[in-house]
Each structure stands twice: as C-alpha cells, then as structure tokens.
A protein has these predicted regions:
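Small-aliphatic-rich amphipathic alpha-helix that forms the alpha element of a beta-alpha
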Residues: 43, 104-143
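A short acidic, glycine/proline-enriched capping/turn motif at secondary-structure boundaries
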Residues: 64-66, 102-106
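Generic beta-strand structural signal
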Residues: 93-95, 134
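N-terminal amphipathic, basic helical "cap/leader" segment at the start of enzyme domains
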Residues: 1-93
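Active-site-flanking beta-strand signature of metal-NTP-handling nucleotidyl enzymes
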Residues: 96-102
C-alpha cells in the first residue's frame, strides 16, 4: 500500500466502493434537499478553464414527461418491451436528476466543446461520488 493511499484511505475506500445501481434496485428514501445540495456542490467543483460551468443540475419533477422523452428517442419500429424499458428509466427510481449541458456535442471538432463535455462528465462523476459518500446509490442513464 502506498504512503499516499494510507494518508487518504477513506477517500480511496469511498471511490473504490462506488458502483452504479440501476433504477429497479434503488429504494427510498431518495436524497433530501440537504443531501442533493451537497452532491451538487461537489459536482460543481470540477476543472473548467473558462471559469463558467457549462452545465446545470435539475431535479425532474415530471417523471411521466421524462418517460415520454425517453420513449420518443427510440426507433420507430421499437417493440413494447423496448418502450417499457425506456419508460422505466424515468419511472422506477425514487428520484431523477438531469445534467443539462450547454454547448456540448460529442461529435464536435471544436476543442472548447470537447473541454465542456469533459467538464460535464467530471461533474457527473463528482455528483455520483457525492451521493455515494452520503450512502445513496445512483446510476447515470441517457435517453
């Protein structure tokens, strides 16, 4: 074990024990306002050379509308099982948060867009780690 690990053992234990847990396995209680505030604060402590955060965190209040969105991006020939699975991403978990990016494009050839995308990804990791440190499980999903 390295000397650095020994000094920061609790940090490494927390990071190394974090794993994604799907919506069907998440249970109540969901994080309260204080827990969310702490996780979002951690999520905003990410490298961004432009000193502006190219994202925002939003608590989803209408899970049915989110389920509609997840279903709407499926191919036209998606079967009922695929539709139910897509909708379940929004409906099964005790709560849903959205990481909304500005000026992000994974297909861009623009260096600034790449940096904004990496900053948003770092924010997501800090958010998940912040929830895990408080005893909450979570998983990132996309539409």
């Amino acid at each position: 074990m390295s000397e650095i690990y020994a000094v920061n053992e609790s940090f490494f234990k927390m990071i190394l024990s974090r794993h994604s847990l799907g919506a069907k396995h998440l249970v109540i209680p969901a994080p309260d306002v204080g827990a969310l505030r702490l996780a979002v604060t951690a999520a905003c402590r990410v490298p961004c050379h432009q000193e502006t955060l190219p994202f925002r965190w939003v608590e989803i209040s209408s899970r049915d509308r989110l389920a509609d969105l997840f279903e709407s991006v499926l191919p036209a020939d998606a079967d009922e099982e695929m539709r139910a699975k897509a909708r379940g991403k929004a409906l099964k978990a005790p709560m849903c948060m959205a990481l909304v990016g500005t000026g992000l494009s994974p297909d861009s050839q623009d260096r600034d867009a790449d940096e904004r995308l990496m900053t948003a990804g770092a924010s997501l990791m800090n958010f998940l780690a912040g929830l895990h440190a408080q005893g909450f499980a979570a998983k990132a999903v996309s539409a």
